[in-house]
Amino acid sequence: MQARTFTGSGRRAQIVTAAIEVIAEVGYAKASFSRIAKHAGLSSTGMISYHFAGKDDLLTACVAEIEQVTGAFMQPRIDAADGHVAQLRTYVESNLALVGEHPAAVRALIDIVKNAASQSPAVNGRLAVFEEHFRAGQAAGVFRPFDVRTVAIALITGLDAVVVTAADTAPEPTELARLGRELADLYVRATALDPEGGSA
C-alpha cells in the first residue's frame, strides 16, 4: 500500500511539474492534456485523468505547487525583514529575484492569473493580504493615510507588469536586483509618511 501511495504521489507530482512547464512554454489556453502527457513522457492522457478530475483540478494543483515554491523562496526573506516598510520592500525585491530562480513557475503563474484567476482563492487573496498589511502599517504609524484597496491594486498590477516583462526577457540577476530596488523604492515612497510628519 505504501509503495502504491508513493508511486501515485510521484506520478501526480510528475504531471503537475509537466503542466507547469507546458503552461510556461505555450500558455494556459494551449496546455492540453495531450501536450502535458507528451511532455511528461506518459503513454496516454488517461494517466492524467486518473489523477485529476479535469483541467480545473490540475490547474488548482499547479497553483498550489507554484505557491509552495514561491513561498519557500520569498517567505523566509519577508519574515526576516524588520517592520512593515522593510517587509513591503522585501516582498517586491524578492518577487523580482524569483523570476531568475524559478522562471517557469513565474511564467506559468502569470498566465494562470491572467486566464483563470477566479479558480485560485490563494491567488485572489493577494489583494486582501496587502490591504491588511497596509492597514496594519497605518495603525503602527509607518504608512501615511491612503485608501488601502486602491494602493493594493496599484501595487499588485504594477508589480505583475514588471514581473511579466522580466519573465519574458530573462534579464541577468543583477538587472533583476536593480528592477526590484527601483520598484520597491517607488512603493515605499508612495506609502511613506510625509517628511513633515503629516499625511500626504
Where are these regions (language model features)?
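Amphipathic alpha-helical packing segments from all-alpha helical-bundle domains
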Residues: 68-75, 116-140, 149-153, 164, ...
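Amphipathic alpha-helical segments used for helix-helix packing
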Residues: 87, 96-118, 164-167
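Short coil/turn segments at alpha/beta junctions that flank glycine-rich nucleotide-binding fingerprints
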Residues: 25-29, 81, 102, 140
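Short, hydrophobic secondary-structure boundary micro-motifs
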Residues: 107-110, 146, 198-200
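Helix-turn-helix
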Residues: 14, 22, 26-57, 61
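C-terminal peripheral helix-coil segments that are non-catalytic and often amphipathic
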Residues: 2, 97, 128-139, 158, ...
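Hydrophobic alpha-helical connector segments
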Residues: 75-104, 151-155, 180
